[in-house]
C-alpha cells in the first residue's frame, strides 16, 4: 500500500497551473525529497501524489495587494482545511501516517512544519531561490524529510545561552526531558536526534558512539534546539542544523524505524548498518 506523501499548493492561480508551474514545483520537490538518504534507499516504500489547489491570485504576498490564498483563515494558516484538501489524493488516506507538503508559490526563504501528537504533519515550504543550502531542496529535506516524517528536532543555534534560562521566545524552554512541548514530543519517542542529558549513556544515540563504524563521527555535541547550552546533538552538523543533504546517523535510524513501522515490517539494526554505512563515506562533511 505504501506510505503517502501529498503535495498541495498555495498561491498558484489558473495561469500558474495551466503553464505547468505547480506540476514542475511538485516534481522538483519529489526529486529533492528522495535525493537524500535514507529516503533514496527506501523510495519504493512511498506513494507520492499532487493535488491541484487553485488560488485566486498568484503568489503569497506582494507590496500593494492582499493575496487571496486558499488555505488561510483570519491571517493564519488553515491547517485543517489543507489536510482535508490533501485527502483528495485518496479517499482512504491515513493522515496520521502521511506527509503533507504545502508548496508556497514564493521565492523567499522560509519554511515550518505543523506536527501533531496523532502523527499527522504538514510542512509549509517556499520555492526558495536562495543559495545552497537554503534553497528549495534544503527546505524540502529539512522540513518534510526531517520534521514531518522523521519527527526530528532542530539542531541549529540562535541563542548563545542555556536553554532553561534564556529569555527568548523561540522555543518552550524545557527544564528537562519531560517538560514543555519538547517533553511531549520526547514522550512520543520523537526528537531522537536531541537530548538534554549530558550523560552519554542516556542519549538516544548511545549505542552508536562506541560502534566501530560510527565512533569517529557520533559523539556528544552541545548546542541544538536554538540554544548553545543545555541541549545536545550527535554529530557536528546535519540537515537538521543547516539544511545540508545529509541526515545524522541517529536521524537516519529514526527515519528508517518509522518507514519500517508504517510498512508493518521489523527494524533490524544490522541491516541498517549494512545499508547506510556507505553514507558516511560519501558524505565527508
Language-model features, listed with the residues they occupy:
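Propeptide-to-catalytic entry region of secreted or membrane-anchored zinc metalloproteases
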Residues: 1-95, 105-108, 277
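Structural recognition of the beta-strand scaffold that forms the well-ordered cores
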Residues: 4-9, 47-50, 99-103, 123-126, ...
